[in-house]
Curated annotation (Swiss-Prot):
Keywords on record: ATP-binding, DNA replication, DNA-binding, Nucleotide-binding
Signal peptide range: none
Binding-site positions, ATP: 52-59
Family of the protein in this entry: Belongs to the herpesviridae OriBP family.
GO molecular-function terms, A-Z: ATP binding; ATP hydrolysis activity; DNA replication origin binding
Listed name of the protein: Replication origin-binding protein
Transmembrane segments: none
Record bears the keyword Glycoprotein: no
Source species of the chain: Human herpesvirus 6B (strain Z29) (HHV-6 variant B)
Amino acid sequence: MENRFQNDTLFSEWFGQSLSDVRFPDNVTVYSQADSAVSFENVRQPIKLVRAAMGSGKTTALIHFLKQVPKELSVLLISCRKTFAAEILHRFTLNGLEDFELYCDITERQINNRKVIVQIESLHRLTENYDVLILDEIMSIIKQFYSKTMTKTKEVDCKFLSLIKNSSHVIAMDATLTRHVVEFFAAFKPDTQIALIRNTFVSAMFSNRVAYFCDTFFGKEFSFFARLEDKLRWDKKLCLFCSTVLAAEYMHDLIRSRFSLKKVLLLTSKQGKCSSIESWIRYDVVIYTSVVTVGLSFEPVYFSSLFVYIQLAKGGPDMVSIFQSIGRVRRVIDEDIYIYMNPVLIKSYDPLAPIAMPPCSDWSVAEQSIISESCIDFRGKCSGAHKYNFCSVLKCLFRYRHYIEKTTITSLSDSLFLLCSLLCENSIKVDIVGNGFPMRKEVFLSFLQILVEECHFIEKKITLPGDNMTFQEIISSRETIMNGDFYENGNQLLHKDYITDMGKFRATFLSPGVDIFIASDIVSDLKNESKRYVFVNVWLQKCVSAGVESTRIERVFNERIKSYVLPKSFLCDEYFVLGDISGVYEWGMLIDLAFLAEMIRKDLKLKSCTDTTTDISEDDLLLCAARRSSDILQIMQLVFTVHVQFFQRYSLQTLQLFNKLRGMRIVTGVFSIEKFSISILRLFFKCAFNMTLSASKPRYIPGKAYRNLTKNDLENMLDNWEISRTNLKTCKELRKALTEASRARRKQTIYKLQGSDISLSVSEVGVFGQHASPGVCVSS
């Protein structure tokens, strides 16, 4: 499973393209189907593994197979999503398979129905094994083991393996099924014959398509938006996929501003889950995000073209998810897809390393060697993830694919390469500004450079507060009255439970000096997932700093924080979970991060990991990086999926190649150990605590900002420096004299953290049982 891979085969190994070059175990028989849709005819092996592209008839073949299954046999179909499960049930019902039940329609907690469709997260509810097991979109099923919604990983993993072990027939299908899936089944059931069906047939509705990659969004005749405008002027119906909510809202507003009479539908997570797409035929333009994915397919011949806006961003959807969302529209009249990748959020000169070499024919041996070394470093760090995946066999076996998917998001060249590979494997032709794929190195690098130079930043919408009153204003106002369970002030309502919730939160998680109004502001911020993540990291680091044993921290974290609920608004009609955090789903990762953060805090002589008042000397930064660089790089990869190589790998030639693959201009000069040290610590603080490590000048008084210096402070500083302050009477005159004296002294550069110092408000004490008073009491 863990054979060494090189940069030229990394994607093909983990996304299925290399199946034709592999020697499989003796219990595996390979079937090739090239000229027709997927078929199980004359395939007698009890385990059938199918790799076939979208539109190759996988579901049709499955339905035909199930119609031939004897009535007395039990059948279980496992899906990756609830919407997919519902769509499969609908397809089954339309084709006469009416005895299947959907897991979410079964009211009993335990499921023992004979024929059932279940989402992977609910697998632990099953009490029986099944004769026939169907794993549709198996790679997406495995991917769900890394999702934060997978709360019972160990139970689901054990049940999944038990089902495979005890089923007499298994069908597993996916467009990117890999050799590792084949090897897993062959090793897990060595005495069972396995059929690997490699189907390369693709229906015309996909094989005739061409994906045009645009290098600019605005500005020229063949830019992304110019093509979109041209289509709309010809009254063509368009479907537009956007990888982020921000991009979708931006495109929605832009189209509405230019084409006010067009009917535009916007589908994002803000509008809720998308369970049906039948209404799309009522609109001129449909804009959707990854809420529309596997399981939802638009079949009517309605849309002329498909447009794809990919905003590359850490934490955004990976290229496989984007590829699956692109395929939701099954028929495109003009058979064209226009794709624009916006790298503005990943533009950086930080030493992030790519993990794959795009398949250009003219890379030099030295360039190939550089990426190969990066690939080896990447593999070495990913291998360390096994200690976090002890509760899941699936997570351990397929961790490389998970890290590849997540790491490529922050690499422009890797993202483009992987998406092009997925399109080509589905027989969709790729056109990059008039060039096919693969292409010459200079053309590929030039395309990346134009993307970066011409990319645009999307401003977030700012919602003005309007007439809304704050928590403090409502309960402090003399005009506020009690109306049932609510405090009422005009049209402003505040449920009495909100006060109780804020008092409880304050007593449990915050320092004694934090009042209930600040607690309310903090809770409002915590509605943002990234803010919750920082809050949890700060709390854990403070626990470690206080000397609390890790076993006790883990127990309290699981019992209190993971399930702690907070109101989304004053009305207390909706709640969110404090432990609903992004990125990290393993306790071991969280606690390792906390211990590393505490060691870094001590090295840098900080009060906390969000301390904004302490000056950090360059010597302390360099010493910290020298001590901790290996641990930092490991955590950066395993927790934050950011790939940075060890310093020894970064020659001038390496940096130049990496900058080219990021679309950045070549920077001359030596990449020093000082620059490397500052870069990795800057990345660490940004990822873990959303703090920015910036170069600055030393503070005149440690712990006190320049703007907060009093007249007495200024006079004492000038006296200590033996600077005459004769005729200097005002603060303005004193400040000017101090600034000029400071320049003359040519002080060394120091560093400081900038951002929100949430550590000042967070306490590790309350959650362990020491409770403060609940806070303010409001009379009715």
